[in-house]
Amino acid sequence: MTNGDIVTANSCQFSDLYFAIRGGGGGTYGVVTSMTVKVYPNKPVVAQSLAITPLAKDTDSLLDAITDIYQQYPNIMDSGFSGYGSWSINSPMPNQTASYMHVVAAMNKSLVQSQKVFDELFQTLQKYNGSSLRILVVWYEFPTYGAYFQAMSGVSQPVGVASPNSAMTSRMFGKAALTTSRTALRNMIGTTAGNSGEPTFNTVELVGGGKVLTDASDKYSSVNPAWRSTYIVSIVARSWSNHSSAETVKDDITNIKGVAMRALDPLLGSYMNEA
């Protein structure tokens, strides 16, 4: 506590502190000296990596395919998958080209069950493969979560923008925003992709949906109630190389890209650390 006392916080005592720490972040709302967590038996993990790159610089087809993927996120996540993705048509990262990639995983599913979850998406993407896009899908099976983490999740990966001078915004998206209007979704993706000469990086956090929403009745699960109907958090970031362009980039992130994201799902919000 602020007076130096150490207390035990749970749903029965100091529940307001428990709510803030559990639902908002331990490092943000309190100093946690020890904790008790519930453990579960180890389960096998099936993971998938998907990488898409355009042929002949066909970024329109890449953005169309990204739209198709976004529309399938709720189905994928309700089937037990979670993970992270990123994409860009003007990447600020060194030696990176226009591309989309993700790694997703699910526990206690067979490879056959997992592949069926993606049947509809890959049937949709088939029309691009080899004609306008190069699509690479790889499946992995691991005996335990620890083996999966060591191989695919616990490795260093490039994060965010290369420059220390950058601005970002984020938006939580629910199922309706992702599935109701393909035109509206494609317009938002086209806006957050950025124009020529705008090095822009998009990150997708597939951390909602499925069991997260099933547990929404737990009032201590999140400070931000928008999480209780969120499927993905989409983050867009841009960098600038000199001070003179900083305000231009900040205005674009806030009033162009951020507004486009908010318009697609005005009822939810932003992730507090990445607003």
How would you label these PLM feature ranges?
Residues M1-A275:
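Soluble FAD-dependent oxygen oxidases
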